Amino acid sequence: MNNWYMLTLMGEDRKGIVAAVTQALFERNVTLGEASMLRLGGNFTIMMMVAADLDAETLEAALAEVVQSMGLTLHIDSMQGGLHQHITPNLIVRVSGADRAGIVARVTGALAEAGFNILDLESDVAGSPENPVYIMQIVGISETPLEELEAAVKDMREEGIEVNISPLETMVG
């Protein structure tokens, strides 16, 4: 019976991280599930669901050489896993405004209170050092009518934070 784990690896971005990690997993007959891998700042981060007939300590030992040679940190959590458990998002929220403390907390808090569930969030700071602009894109799902979600972020718009909520067309298949 396979055990499911969430692996989180992070280290300074360099060539070959994904190849080395996935090769080590392949050599131990570990099944890869969903994954998110991206560069943030100068670092590369991997979050990956895996299934294996190994305990967490053996899985950690299987990755030890790669972790050490690539200068990575590794965190392993046991989880209830499975493949093909996708939720199809129905809304996208785009946010921009002068970079200031609390934008993420305020927008996501208002959306959550209105019944919006975040599936993916990406953010960046654009503009210049003198005039930074915070940009955020949120993909999620909600059964709350669009008008109610719009009302939930109305105060932020009045403060100069641009928040656009629109239906998301998702092609499946």
Positions of PLM-derived features:
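A conserved regulatory-domain signal marking ACT and ACT-like small-molecule sensing domains
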Residues: 1-173
